[in-house]
Amino acid sequence: MDGSSDNLIAVGRISGTHGIRGQLRLHSYSGNLESLQAAKNVLIRFPAGGTRQIQLKKAAYHSGKFLLTLEGFDTIEKAQELAGAELLLQREQLPPPDADEYYWHDLLGLSVVTNEGQALGIIKDILETGANDVYLVRDDATKREYLIPAIASVISSVNIHTGTMTITPLEGLLDL
C-alpha cells in the first residue's frame, strides 16, 4: 500500500466496538460501503500517531451502522485499541467521484473566493449537518471564519487543479 499522503483518503473513523468478537463500528465519511467491501487491505491511522496496514476480512452494514472485521482483531479487548483511529484507503481503491462531487480530502485546503474576487480563506473543515455539508472557511490572517453551505446555489465552481473554490454567497452569509 502506497503510504504517500496524496494517495491516501480517510474514509471513516472507528467509533467503537460491536459485540465481543472484535467487530468495529465505523463512522463513514462517505457512506460508500462498496469501496470498503472491495478493499483487501486498509491503513489505520492511530490518534496518537503512526499507521498500520491491516487486512480487511469483512465490511457490512447492520442496523444503520458500518461494521468491520479486521485480521488479528478477534476480541473486544484488541478491537478497543483501534477506537478513534481513522481508516484510510488508497485513492485507487475508491471509485472516481461523479461530476460535481469531490472527496473531502480534495476539498480541504482549497482557497475560497467569491464570484466578485473577494478572498475568504481556506477550507479547514467539513461539517456534516444532515441536509448538506458545510465548509468551515478560515482566513488565518484575520482569524475570521465563515460557514459556507455546500449547495449548488452557493458553490459556483471547484477547481482542484488550481486549488480554488468560487462561491456566490447568499445575502448576509458573509456578514455574520
From Swiss-Prot:
Disulfide bonds: none annotated. GO terms for cellular component: cytoplasm; ribosome. The PRC barrel domain binds ribosomal protein uS19. One of its GO terms (molecular function) is ribosome binding. An accessory protein needed during the final step in the assembly of 30S ribosomal subunit, possibly for assembly of the head region. Essential for efficient processing of 16S rRNA. May be needed both before and after RbfA during the maturation of 16S rRNA. It has affinity for free ribosomal 30S subunits but not for 70S ribosomes. This is Ribosome maturation factor RimM. One of its GO terms (biological process) is ribosomal small subunit biogenesis. Binds ribosomal protein uS19.
